[in-house]
Amino acid sequence: MQTHVLFEHPLNEKMRTWLRIEFLIQQMKALLPVSDHASALHFFRNVGDLLDVFERGDTRTELLKELERQQRKLQSWAEVPGVDNERIESLRHELKARSSMLMAAPRLGQTLREDRLIALVRQRLSIPGGCCSFDLPLLHVWLCSPQEERDVQVNSWLATLQPLTYTLDMILDLIRQSAPFRKQTSLNGFYQDNGDDADLLRLQLPLQEALYPQISGHKSRFAIRFMPLDSEHGRVPERFDFELACC
């Protein structure tokens, strides 16, 4: 039984974008295989949202910069006495491999953007009920095709995202592991601290307290206000302990 709930909050725009991309790709895979209209619309809606995120900024450039930054951090750690140099060298090799893979890949989302079925469904998703069979006969026929054929098509779409997912998974994993959780205490539901140039806040709260955080701030300073899930009858303890990692 789950006893704690984890919250993650970005402290800059690049991290906000990366977390959204991670979430959307997870959602794309959540209802696979695509076997009916419900799972199809769930899949295509998240594909469309992902393409919208790609169009708002140069995600690949930001990821390549982060790969370089992580390599520099590993290089500085390699000079610390007693560190596992073999592990550091292995991580640096993985970072270089992902950098090469990402640089060699086509523009992010280009294959998905040019696919006729994805483009047609994406256009209709903004219309309430706009994906009926009379609106999208192509989708209707596709959903009536053998499951094996749809699986091949969906897997080919997902494969075009592999350079991105491999890179993003490693970057987020390194960032999340960069700082341990430490016990903190809020007073009257409020807590603030310096960000120390962190990219990401991670909070673990006891589920039984039925609280959630409202977080504001940036990499230099942040503030957290805890709110009761039940806005009418819930209350926030005068002193509330939680776990916090500034990554």
Curated annotation (Swiss-Prot):
Q: Which gene encodes it?
A: zapD
PANTHER family, per the entry: CELL DIVISION PROTEIN ZAPD
Q: What is this protein called?
A: Cell division protein ZapD
| Gene Ontology CC entries for this record | cell division site; cytoplasm
Which InterPro entries does the entry mention? ZapD, ZapD_C, ZapD_sf
Predominant location category? cytoplasm
Sorted UniProt keywords: Cell cycle, Cell division, Cytoplasm, Septation
Q: Which organism does this record belong to?
A: Cronobacter sakazakii (strain ATCC BAA-894)
Q: How does it assemble?
A: Interacts with FtsZ.
GO terms (BP aspect): division septum assembly; FtsZ-dependent cytokinesis
Q: According to its UniProt record, where is this protein located?
A: Cytoplasm
Q: Which family does it belong to?
A: Belongs to the ZapD family.
State what this protein does. Cell division factor that enhances FtsZ-ring assembly. Directly interacts with FtsZ and promotes bundling of FtsZ protofilaments, with a reduction in FtsZ GTPase activity.
